[in-house]
Swiss-Prot record:
Coiled coil: none annotated. Keywords: Nucleus. Residues 29-41, 72-89 have a biased composition (Basic and acidic residues). It comes from Drosophila melanogaster. Residues 29-152 are annotated as: Disordered. Expressed in the brain. This is Bacchus. The gene is Bacc. It comes from the Eukaryota.
């Protein structure tokens, strides 16, 4: 073997060794995660088995309190009623009343015909002649004489 080939082979072996080490590290990591998940599942099962409905009232209350997650208030999800001031309520009512009057005025303008658009803009002249379209009865080979042109 030449020196270059030997060096290349040694490099390839080193790369393969690093890759094998990485694979074994990943496998070990997956095994550790699986073991941790198994322990968590076993702890959950033990907690469920501890209180299978046979405990007396008040017994294992500490265990139940520890197992139940604490309720935390989430800010911004609900607005307390005290936060709304009387002035804001009055302002909303006044705005709603003003909005109704604007809508009524718009409806009156439509009904009365007050429009900013001139009617001449929609007059389209027709330069062609109107042709009367007549149906030819020549192709009524299947006419049974009943007067109905429905196809059967």
């Amino acid at each position: 073997m030449s020196a270059a080939t030997e060096q290349q082979n040694n490099g390839d072996v080193a790369v393969e060794k690093v890759a094998a080490d990485d694979v074994s590290a990943v496998k070990d990591d997956l095994k550790a995660k699986a073991a941790a998940e198994d322990k968590a599942a076993a702890a959950d099962a033990a907690g469920d088995a501890a209180d299978n409905g046979t405990s007396k009232d008040g017994e294992d209350a500490a265990d139940a309190a520890a197992a139940a997650p604490a309720k935390e208030s989430v800010k911004g999800t609900k607005r307390p009623a005290e936060a709304k001031s009387a002035e804001s309520k009055k302002a909303k009512k006044a705005a709603a009343a003003d909005g109704d009057s604007d809508e009524e005025e718009a409806l009156e303008e439509i009904i009365e015909g007050d429009s900013e658009i001139e009617s001449d803009e929609y007059d389209i002249p027709y330069d062609g002649e109107e042709d009367d379209i007549e149906c030819d009865d020549d192709d009524d080979d299947n006419d049974d004489g009943s007067g109905s042109d429905d196809q059967a």
